[in-house]
A protein has these predicted regions:
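N-terminal flexible/basic segments that precede or flank functional cores
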Residues: 1-2, 43, 52-55
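A short, Lys/Arg-rich alpha-helix, primarily the initiator
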Residues: 1-16, 62
Length: 65
C-alpha cells in the first residue's frame, strides 16, 4: 500500500515536535495501534487527514502555552 503524502508530512511534524503515536492516540480517543495503521497507510478512514492534523496542531498549541 502506498502511504498518502499527508501521512509522511504529519509523521515528520510529529517527529520534529516530539509527539508520539501514543500522545496522538490519546488526543484522538483511539489506540496507538490504530494511529500507526492510519499513518502507515493500512487504514484510510474518511476524514482522517483533517482529524489527525487538528489533533497534532492542538498538541503543539498545548505545549506552547
Amino acid at each position: 500500500m502506498l502511504s498518502k503524502e499527508w501521512t509522511g508530512n504529519l509523521v515528520g511534524l510529529m517527529h520534529n515536535e516530539k509527539i508520539t503515536n501514543i500522545q496522538l492516540a490519546e488526543k484522538l480517543g483511539v489506540t496507538d495501534r490504530y494511529v500507526s495503521m492510519v499513518l502507515n497507510g493500512h487504514r484510510e478512514p474518511d476524514g482522517a487527514e483533517q482529524r489527525f492534523r487538528a489533533a497534532v496542531d492542538e498538541l503543539i498549541r498545548e505545549r506552547k502555552t
